Amino acid sequence: MTITTLTLGMILAAYLAGSISSAVLVCRLRGLPDPRTAGSGNPGATNVLRIGGASSAAMVLFFDMLKGALPAYIAFRLGIDQVALGAIAIAACLGHIFPIFFKFKGGKGVATAFGAMAPIGHELALALMVTWIVMVLISRYSSLAAITTAMLAPIYTWFLDERFTIPVAMLSTLIVIRHRDNIHRLLKGEESKVSRKKKG
């Protein structure tokens, strides 16, 4: 990896972009409980689905993915090498996980990581989306779907565009590590399943 002023600037910009908590902002705008203290306590799309319904969750998902996609796409267009590209994508995820603007209490980084992978190609984006949806439908566990999709992402990338296998593997490793508590709960049968807010 070649460290340049441009690379360092992109890493900082990606972290700051990732630090904008879509879940907290959407919940504030829509008069919903703070996702850091309500539901599962995780400020991400799945928890917003639980406490605010599908439309709010969709907004959070879109903006969380955008936080990863924009820095990765800009870095790619600037010709930054693949390993540095992975570092920039990870910086966006770390911003989401440890946001400087929200007392370093963030989400799991799944949507942001998948957003960073999406610019690699439509085929990869579709494969990731289908894998996640199928796993959720089968298991009803968002965490298991995220872990499974993350583990398969480097394999998909190897077949579709092997140049980006290393940065995708870096992101996948971060996602799995971030879900270590979920893995323990899954093994104990204590993990919460996906649900949505019931209409009153």
UniProtKB/Swiss-Prot annotation:
GO molecular function, one term: acyl-phosphate glycerol-3-phosphate acyltransferase activity
EC number: 2.3.1.275
Pathway the protein contributes to: Lipid metabolism; phospholipid metabolism
Keywords assigned by UniProt, alphabetized: Cell inner membrane, Cell membrane, Lipid biosynthesis, Lipid metabolism, Membrane, Phospholipid biosynthesis, Phospholipid metabolism, Transferase, Transmembrane, Transmembrane helix
Transmembrane stretches, start-end: 6-26, 56-76, 82-102, 118-138, 141-161
Record membrane topology: Multi-pass membrane protein
Pfam families: G3P_acyltransf (PF02660)
Catalytic reaction equation(s): an acyl phosphate + sn-glycerol 3-phosphate = a 1-acyl-sn-glycero-3-phosphate + phosphate
InterPro entries: G3P_acylTferase_PlsY
One GO biological process term: phospholipid biosynthetic process
Annotated GO CC locations: plasma membrane
Cell location: Cell inner membrane
Domain of life: Bacteria
Family classification: Belongs to the PlsY family.
NCBIfam families: glycerol-3-phosphate 1-O-acyltransferase PlsY
Complexes and interactors: Probably interacts with PlsX.
Role played: Catalyzes the transfer of an acyl group from acyl-phosphate (acyl-PO(4)) to glycerol-3-phosphate (G3P) to form lysophosphatidic acid (LPA). This enzyme utilizes acyl-phosphate as fatty acyl donor, but not acyl-CoA or acyl-ACP.
Protein name: Glycerol-3-phosphate acyltransferase
Top-level taxonomy: Bacteria, Pseudomonadati, Pseudomonadota, Gammaproteobacteria, Alteromonadales
